[in-house]
From Swiss-Prot:
It catalyses: ATP + H2O + cellular proteinSide 1 = ADP + phosphate + cellular proteinSide 2. It comes from the Bacteria. PROSITE patterns: SECA (PS01312), SECA_MOTOR_DEAD (PS51196). PANTHER family: CHLOROPLAST PROTEIN-TRANSPORTING ATPASE, SECA INNER MEMBRANE COMPONENT OF SEC PROTEIN SECRETION SYSTEM. It comes from Beijerinckia indica subsp. indica (strain ATCC 9039 / DSM 1715 / NCIMB 8712). Its cofactor is Zn(2+). This is Protein translocase subunit SecA. Part of the Sec protein translocase complex. Interacts with the SecYEG preprotein conducting channel. Has a central role in coupling the hydrolysis of ATP to the transfer of proteins into and across the cell membrane, serving both as a receptor for the preprotein-SecB complex and as an ATP-driven molecular motor driving the stepwise translocation of polypeptide chains across the membrane. The gene is secA.
Amino acid sequence: MWATLAKKIFGTANDRRLKGYRPKVAAINALEPEIQKLSDEELAAQTITLRAQLAEGKTLDDLIVPAFATVREAARRVLGQRHFDVQLIGGMVLHEGGIAEMRTGEGKTLVATLATYLNALAGQGVHVVTVNDYLARRDAEWMGQVYRFLGLSTGIIVHGLDDAQRREAYAADITYGTNNEFGFDYLRDNMKYELSHMVQRGHAFAIVDEVDSILIDEARTPLIISGPSDDKSDLYNLVDTLIPKLNDEDFELDEKQRSTNLTEAGNEHIEELLREIGALHDGSLYDAVNVTLVHHVNQALRAHKLFQRDKDYIERNGEIVIIDEFTGRMMPGRRYSEGLHQALEAKEHVQVQPENVTLASITFQNYFRLYKKLAGMTGTAATEADEFAEIYRLEVVSIPTNNPVRRHDEDDEVYRSGEEKLRAITREIEAAGQTLQPMLVGTTSIEKSEQLAAFMLQQGYKQIDFSEPKALQKLYAAARSGKPSKLFAVLNARFHEQEAYIVAEAGVPGAITIATNMAGRGTDIKLGGNVDMRVEQECASLPPGPDRDAKEAEIRAEVDSFRDQAIAAGGLYIIGTERHESRRIDNQLRGRSGRQGDPGRSKFFLSLKDDLMRIFGSDRMESMLLKLGLKEDEAIVHPWINKALEKAQQKVEARNFEMRKNILKYDNVMNDQRKVVFEQRREMMGQDSLEEMIHDMRTGVVDDLVGKFVPHDAYPEAWDIEGLTQGLETALNLALPLADWAKEEGITDEAMHERLQQAAETAYAERAERNGPDLMRYIEKQVVLQVLDHLWREHLVTLDHLRQVIGWRGLAQRDPLNEYKSEAFALFDELITQLRETTTAQLSRVEVAFAPSADQSPFETLAAAAPFDPVPAVPPLAASLALEGPTETGQTAVSFMPQQGVEAFNGRDVLVAAEPTIPTLERNADDPKSWGRVGRNEPCPCGSGKKYKHCHGMIS
């Protein structure tokens, strides 16, 4: 009570924040008449004036008033749109690095121009991030008119651009693109071998559109660049045949936690089935040698019991395509990791693609935290304000609407079963259709949308076929006649090509649009229809002239008439068929109605069998409703139901927040190491010579060898001369008379150390002289970078495996996170040691084995042949330096191995890239000392067929 009273007297924190912006809004308005007097040339020259003021020492904050006034006037002249006062406030929130929560239809795209222009004046580049290529192109072309008028350059980053085009786009003052493209470019840049090949120029300021979708919904999705690994499709298909044979008592299913596990009986049953097909020979399923089988069984079990076709994924053209649980959109190119996607392919009997090995990865959480300043816009952020503040340090400011919201949100109706709910929804659609009220019916999955569509077809409705050229003419004709059309459109992942068109016409009187979740987000539903899209569709075949002008005028008049009809019918009616786990998604659905002061209404129809009610609702809810005498086809409507559902949603949101926080804690460990590796890489690429670093590495290797085989202050008789001889051969390619040295009178460990160091330096200097010092400097840099990349990839795999099993440490009363940090640090320390040893060993064997052309030096020939870029621009191929086995002279020759090009990148989550050729030494299967460092997941060099970690790796 006191909190409510205090809010009435003092206002909320949001109200006080808004009040602080009012003086600057007033100053911008006061400057407007003066700005309006400027000619187009004088207005455009404001950019030069403002940049000059920055150079003289003014800050961006000092320039808010003139900059915003300039953009407002430019938008009025170029677009015919003038920023409202509330939009000016939104621009200030973005400039300060906050999140502007603005309702649908309030002009977020236009608001972004204010902060974008102001920050672009600094010349460090501004990134405007959208959720898909369509919106990136649309916004760049639309708002780009304003920026170009003011003398700023714009670029766009979408799929299909080569590196030169990307570099040009990033060099622009303002760059539009999708979150995935920005993230993947960052990863690809950190796999380049020359600074000049990189495309991004830094991370100064980013404005993220639909910030909740990208930073909350996508937070758990890592961006992964990967390369193919071994083909195990037969094993996936084999294990897949066993899962349907399991009984209900063989596994436990937890829908809340999205997990499934075999019971003790299930373990025995699956072991029996595996033995029958010859996949399990000796011992238990959980013996170390069978760890791969356990992994395949677990993923197959998840694929069959947790993932549903047409809800979590669809089968399209022989491929499994993931469906975004929040938007209902397909995500082509994105694949589940850790073999789950392969298990789904086996389940649906399509070709099982090879698993991928991670080359580089980063989460959106960590990518967007690279920016010095980050801002965002969305229609719904208040429910996640705590998460934005805690994870990203972003404050959410709710911007008031320019016109009051006139949408009426009604209480939910709850029915006993799904069939009763469908009948109630159809009755509601029938009733609203009598007045030609446009309706948007939101569902949570493709399966649910098609279930409702099938039910409506049974009731005599007809589905609009958008493959027909004049698909909507019947709907327009019905609107003209004032009679219900009984036509409906379906928008889900199957019809995503027509998404913008279907959504644009959802505001036509009498239109019924069934959509999955937030499909079509980013496209406004305008009452009466979208006049521009309709003109484009219906006038496309008409040449410019009187006939086209007349047709366009006719369409515009009809759309205005339809708008009046839709308003008279009550505006857009949002019908929700199920509550989502997140209140934010429900609010987004409701927010499609009542844009810019239009009327509207919304209501959710629920059943006790809905997922949220069944999994997260109170166990007593169903029994209580039945005691109240709830009969068939009878609904209960009560504010208590809404509160109970909201509590269930809050529980789910809190759980998801904790999961994201926990993931971030673990990811931060890898992120800290990633920063070190990427910064070190960039520093090495920027140096002309790594001679000093290579010298330090060589010195470190000698120190390690002496420390291992020549104990300090020990007599020569105690030295391990045989071990030292082998160590020098492996690590430094040196054959020295160590036994004779050890017999010398008065020889000490310090003297031995000094001789070894001198011998290593002399041998390397001679090699550099033979190859040419300039060429050797070039080779040194490429070898160090390639070895670092190879070790980093293996390190990522090892960390991933560690993360999967570290949770079991909790059973021993040890904190898994601290254990993970400790072991990850030890592994990283080992990586540094291996980098030193492997680089030194490789460079000690380098010998150039080709003749340069007559007019080129060896360095020029090598540089021209091998750009050393493991992720080249598509489509050219790159050549990669490889170190072959010893030649007849006992040296290792440099050759040029053509490298596979990067496969066309269609996707969001995983880029399948060719794996760079890694310098390797010739290995003798019978001599483990010749193997060098073997990756834990590589086949054991002994030829057993097992992974190294399950063979000689266990011994070592």
